[in-house]
A protein has these predicted regions:
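Short N-terminal segments immediately surrounding and downstream of signal-peptide cleavage
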Residues: 33-50
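Short, N-terminal intrinsically disordered low-complexity segments that are rich in Pro/Gly
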Residues: 42, 46, 65-69, 74
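A mature extracytoplasmic/lumenal domain signature
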Residues: 47, 52, 208-210
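Short, compositionally biased leader-like segments
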Residues: 1-15
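Peptidyl-prolyl cis-trans isomerase
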Residues: 2-6, 34-38, 69-235
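Short, surface-exposed, low-complexity cationic segments
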Residues: 54-68
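Sec/Tat signal peptide C-region and signal peptidase I cleavage site
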Residues: 28-32
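Bacterial N-terminal signal peptides
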Residues: 13-27
C-alpha cells in the first residue's frame, strides 16, 4: 500500500494520459463523421453531401460509376441534376411502387456482390440503410422519369440508321444497336436541354472543392465493378 501511495501521482498521470488518448480517438471519429457529410452543394435549401456521391458511385446510381477518384464539382452537379429530376418526378406523380423499389434495392445489392456484401459495406462506412435506400429509390424515379418524359418520345427512322452506318450493308443486329445508340444520344440531348432550363428555376450553390477535389469519405464496395446496361445511363 505504501508503494502504491508513493507512486500514486505517477499512476494518475498515466491514467490521465490514457483518458486523453481515448478522448482524442473519439474526437477523431467525430471529425471523420463530420467529413462524411461534407456539404458539396445546396439545392433550394436541401444539401448534397460527400457521402451521397460515394453511395452513388458505389451503387452505380444516377449514371455514376464506381471510382475512388477525388470528388469534384462534376460529381456534385450529377447529384444536383438527380435532385432536380426527383423533384419533377414527384410533381408528375412518377415513382416506383413498393415492389419496384424493393427490386431496385435488390439490384443495387447484386451490383456489389449481394445483400450481405452491401450491408457489410454500409456497416464499415457508417451508412444508415434508410438513407441509402432513399438514394436507390431516387435513382429509380430518375430512370423512370427519363423513360417516360424523354425516351418514350424518341423515334429513330430507318433512314437515320442508314445515314449513321453509311451505304454498306449491315446485319439487322448492327442496325438495332445503332438505333439504340442514336435513341440514347437523342434522349441525352433532350434531357440536357431540360436540365439546363430546370437549373435556372432553382437556387443552386456549390462548395469550393479546390483543383484537386476532396477525397471520398470511405472506399468503394470491393465488388462494385458492374455497370448498368441501360444506354441512357452513361456519364
Amino acid at each position: 500500500m505504501a508503494i502504491l501511495h508513493r507512486y500514486r501521482p505517477r499512476l494518475l498521470k498515466v491514467a490521465a494520459g490514457f483518458t486523453l488518448a481515448a478522448l482524442l480517438c473519439v474526437a477523431s471519429a467525430a471529425v471523420a463523421a463530420t467529413f462524411l457529410d461534407a456539404v458539396l452543394a445546396d439545392v433550394a435549401g436541401r444539401t448534397i453531401v460527400a457521402s451521397d456521391v460515394a453511395v452513388a458511385r458505389g451503387l452505380s446510381l444516377f449514371g455514376a460509376r464506381p471510382s475512388d477518384a477525388p470528388i469534384r464539382k462534376g460529381d456534385a452537379e450529377r447529384l444536383v441534376d438527380g435532385r432536380l429530376i426527383d423533384q419533377e418526378a414527384a410533381q408528375l406523380a412518377i415513382g416506383g411502387n413498393p415492389q419496384e423499389a424493393e427490386e431496385a434495392w435488390q439490384a443495387a445489392a447484386e451490383r456489389v456482390g449481394g445483400m450481405a456484401a452491401l450491408h457489410a459495406w454500409m456497416d464499415r462506412s457508417l451508412l444508415d440503410e434508410a438513407r441509402v435506400r432513399r438514394l436507390v429509390e431516387a435513382d429509380l424515379r430518375w430512370r423512370q422519369f427519363v423513360d417516360l418524359r424523354f425516351r418514350a418520345f424518341v423515334f429513330i427512322s430507318e433512314a437515320e440508321v442508314t445515314a449513321a452506318l453509311g451505304p454498306e450493308t449491315h446485319s439487322q443486329e448492327v442496325r438495332e444497336r445503332t438505333r439504340e445508340r442514336l435513341r440514347a444520344e437523342a434522349t441525352d440531348r433532350d434531357l440536357a436541354e431540360w436540365l439546363s432550363e430546370a437549373r435556372k428555376r432553382v437556387s443552386v450553390r456549390y462548395a469550393a472543392l479546390g483543383e484537386g477535389g476532396i477525397p471520398l469519405p470511405f472506399p468503394m464496395p470491393p465488388l462494385a465493378d458492374q455497370t448498368p446496361k441501360d444506354p441512357a445511363r452513361r456519364p
